[in-house]
UniProtKB/Swiss-Prot annotation:
Protein name per Swiss-Prot or TrEMBL: 5-methyltetrahydropteroyltriglutamate--homocysteine methyltransferase 1
Pathway: Amino-acid biosynthesis; L-methionine biosynthesis via de novo pathway; L-methionine from L-homocysteine (MetE route): step 1/1
EC number: 2.1.1.14
Organism: Arabidopsis thaliana
Gene Ontology CC: one annotated term: plasma membrane
Cross-referenced InterPro entries: Cbl-indep_Met_Synth_N (IPR013215), Cobalamin-indep_Met_synthase (IPR006276), Met_Synth_C/arc (IPR002629), UROD/MetE-like_sf (IPR038071)
Tissue: Expressed in leaves, stems, flowers, siliques and seeds.
Primary residence: cytoplasm
Entry function: Catalyzes the transfer of a methyl group from 5-methyltetrahydrofolate to homocysteine resulting in methionine formation.
Residues the entry annotates as binding L-methionine: 437-439, 490, 605
HAMAP family named among the record's database cross-references: Meth_synth (MF_00172)
Cofactors (names): Zn(2+)
Binding locations of Zn(2+) 2: 658, 662
Catalytic function, reaction form: 5-methyltetrahydropteroyltri-L-glutamate + L-homocysteine = tetrahydropteroyltri-L-glutamate + L-methionine
Length: 765
């Protein structure tokens, strides 16, 4: 019985790749140094999978930034602004596309389906001159082979690649991305031919868009593309891998009829209905790669349940055609539980990170083949039983409070325009008020103080003194820049979710449970293992201290319940919305305590609201209903004169704008600087928005400092579709990852731009 892993985390168990990348970007190390760290990581991953008994080990799932960007490089689809002139694409062009450089901005970055991973969106048009410009897939296959490991090279499939792309600026609206298939397929053929020549016997093509709602023409593109590739694929075993959801019946029919394809991979964790399709009919003689081990969470697999699913499938496809797999790439989970030396033993027994999931996949494959590891299986059953019965998981008071929410929709008593009038009387802000999103740069010194305080090497008194000084520095800087609504800079916070989770019951924390978000940026999601409540106030002390340093309004900064949920590893023993309502009640207590503590502007970030949106339209309404309701619960108890802000990230808002309005926030700030036009088009098309809105005026993800003219131009474009009395001027996200040398001039230019336009508007009256 064979085993397979869809993909594996790249960062390394101690984030080795992150530090190597950042050292290279800062000019402190060479390309050779970076390549050595990368090669060592790849080698250890392949050897680890091989040692565990994995038959189908992936290669080319490693990336220095992103696998879609790797595909863009493979196809030579470099936008003209990066000055690429042909030949093998080097790190300079590659990283310029990902991060921008001193003279040109980065390509757009967006969520990878409904995960917290981001990919770099290809910019395509009829003029793109495709060429085979990165031999990475072949090189990595050969690299593994030289180490004695035969791998399955993984490529982003051609149809998914095009459907995940966008039309470049200036391309005619009638342009169809799929019209480029005849141009990219010859390059796929070259790559596949080279892989065959290098000795590959299997190839994996990831076509995750098959789980989306695709109309007939898009499904036909799959049929046509694979018919075109058939002769090149001949002689290879070809796995088409899907993940993240059920595959719709029509797409299943299309997929299982593709020419040249010998194996199909399905997510059977999130895709429970796919099982019914397989049971109703699976093509004879083909392989089924059964994704029964969850690639997106950290809970130990239920061996008994998985084994029973696999045995049922074995009866349909046959023993020699069933392969045990992960539900998706393990990129979306933490790397290795072995590094968690401080985690509570009971909770630890309930978990499995990527390295443990490799063991789980192989244990299930062996059990199916009649070589069951009895000790491992009984330990698994004991851990599951302990989790089900542990008193740490259930809190009756929380269960009752959450149950009492049913039947009410928790809205503020007054409508938004009346509230904004009450708030303006109190805050007295100019038109186009300026603010920032919350965090300010975190210096090495600041991180050291936090780390030492956590390790009890610094007294509480010294810690408070250091944080107070940092807050004072941030407040003084904002006053000097003449920003209207201030923030305290969040120097006490390591992460916008972890900080709250550490103070809520029902959460556990890892030391090294890092997951890649984009590029070198990793997040360490908390683990929600039980009912959630707030034992005491979490942010009031610091926010009140910051407000005492200035006469200007100071924003209290909270992370919203939906974002805490979507950026955590969430318990899988109750529906997600029930956990979300519990978090909402805890945040509601905090909002009301901030108001009592004299904070008149409170921001409740829902950066991740959209990313939790199910992939299929039929499931959107239910999700949006409970997500928006959770947000309203947090602030339904405050006075009209308290201004509630929210912030959202990387969102394609067009499809959820009515839900955003229904959140009923007083002001919404949006991270949109890489997707300007998309956002403004929503308002251009006549959506009436009565609350305050601050579309980000510059991109904080790039080191580039925008000029005041550029920012003013952006604000003017916004004023063409938004009323001047509702527009706010702000960066598109928090400034934590930037340096002060970048932040000061950028914010100065932002304030100058706002003042310039204010004076233009005043003189135009």
């Amino acid at each position: 019985m064979a085993s397979h892993i869809v993909g594996y985390p790249r960062m390394g168990p101690k984030r080795e790749l992150k530090f190597a990348l950042e050292s290279f970007w800062d000019g402190k190390s060479t390309a050779e140094d970076l390549q050595k760290v990368s090669a060592d990581l790849r080698s250890s991953i392949w050897k680890q999978m091989s040692a565990a008994g994995t038959k189908f080990i992936p290669s080319n799932t490693f990336a220095h930034y992103d696998q879609v960007l790797d595909t863009t490089a493979m196809l030579g689809a470099v936008p003209p602004r990066y000055g690429y002139t042909g030949g093998e694409i080097g790190l300079d062009v590659y990283f310029s596309m990902a991060r921008g450089n001193a003279s040109v901005p980065a390509m757009e970055m967006t969520k990878w389906f409904d995960t917290n991973y981001h990919y770099i969106v290809p910019e395509l048009g009829p003029e793109v001159n495709f060429s085979y410009a990165s031999h990475k897939a072949v090189n990595e296959y050969k690299e593994a082979k030289a180490l004695g490991v035969d791998t399955v090279p993984v490529l982003v499939g051609p149809v998914s690649y095009l459907l995940l792309s966008k039309a470049a600026k200036g391309v005619d609206k009638s342009f169809e991305l799929l019209s480029l298939l005849p141009k990219i397929l010859p390059i796929y053929k070259e790559v596949i031919t080279e892989l065959k020549a290098a000795g590959a016997t299997w190839i994996q093509l990831d076509e995750p868009v098959l789980v989306m709602d695709l109309e007939g023409q898009k499904l036909q593109a799959f049929t046509g593309a694979y018919a075109e590739l058939e002769s090149t694929l001949s002689g290879l075993n070809v796995l088409v891998e899907t993940y993240f959801a059920d595959i719709p019946a029509e797409a299943y029919k299309t997929l299982t009829s593709l020419k040249g394809v010998t194996a199909f991979g399905f997510d059977l964790v999130r895709g429970t209905k796919t099982l019914d399709l397989v049971k109703a009919g699976f093509p004879e003689g083909k392989y089924l790669f059964a994704g029964v081990v969850d690639g997106r969470n950290i809970w130990a697999n239920d061996f008994a349940a998985s084994l029973s699913t696999l045995q049922a499938l074995e009866g349909i496809v046959g023993k020699d055609k069933l392969v045990v797999s992960t539900s998706c790439s393990l990129l979306h989970t933490a790397v290795d539980l072995i590094n968690e030396t401080k985690l509570d033993d009971e909770i630890k027994s309930w978990l499995a990170f990527a390295a443990q999931k490799v063991v789980e996949v192989n244990a299930l494959a062996k059990a199916l083949a009649g070589q069951k590891d009895e000790a491992l299986f009984s330990a698994n059953a004991a851990a599951l039983a302990s989790r089900r019965s542990s008193p740490r998981v259930t809190n009756e008071g929380v269960q009752k409070a959450a149950a009492a929410l049913k039947g009410s929709d928790h809205r503020r008593a007054t409508n938004v325009s009346a509230r904004l009038d009450a708030q303006q009387k109190k805050l007295n802000l100019p038109i186009l008020p300026t603010t920032t999103i919350g965090s300010f740069p975190q210096t090495v010194e600041l991180r050291r103080v936090r780390r030492e305080y956590k390790a009890k090497k610094v007294s509480e008194e010294d810690y408070v003194k250091a944080i107070k000084e940092e807050i004072k520095k941030v407040v003084d800087l904002q006053e000097e820049l003449d920003i209207d609504v201030l923030v305290h800079g969040e120097p006490e916070r390591n992460d916008m979710v972890e900080y709250f989770g550490e103070q809520l019951s029902g959460f556990a924390f890892t030391a090294n449970g890092w997951v890649q978000s984009y590029g070198s940026r990793c997040v360490k999601p908390p683990v929600i293992y039980g009912d959630v409540s707030r034992p005491k106030a979490m942010t009031v002390f610091w926010s009140a201290m910051a407000q005492s340093m200035t006469s200007r309004p100071m924003k209290g900064m909270l992370t919203g319940p939906v974002t805490i949920l979507n950026w955590s590893f969430v318990r899988n023993d109750q529906p997600r919305h029930e956990t979300c309502y519990q978090i909402a009640l805890a945040i509601k207590d905090e909002v009301e305590d901030l108001e009592k503590g004299g904070i008149g502007v409170i921001q409740i970030d829902e950066a991740a609201l959209r990313e939790g949106l199910p992939l299929r339209k039929s499931e959107h309404a239910f999700y949006l209903d409970w997500a928006v309701h959770s947000f309203r619960i947090t602030n339904c108890g405050v006075q009209d004169s308290t201004q509630i802000h929210t912030h959202m990230c990387y969102s394609h808002f067009n499809d959820i704008i009515h839900s955003i309005i229904d959140m009923d926030a007083d002001v919404i700030t949006i991270e949109n600087s890489r997707s300007d036009e998309k956002l403004l088009s929503v308002f251009r098309e006549g959506v009436k928005y009565g609350a305050g809105i601050g579309p980000g005026v510059y991109d904080i993800h790039s080191p580039r400092i925008p000029s005041s003219e550029e920012i003013a131009d952006r604000v003017n474009k916004m004023l063409a579709v938004l009323e001047q009395n509702i527009l706010w001027v702000n960066p598109d996200c928090g400034l934590k990852t930037r340096k002060y040398t970048e932040v000061k001039p950028a914010l100065k230019n932002m304030v100058d731009a706002a003042k310039l336009i204010r004076s233009q508007l005043a003189s135009a009256k």
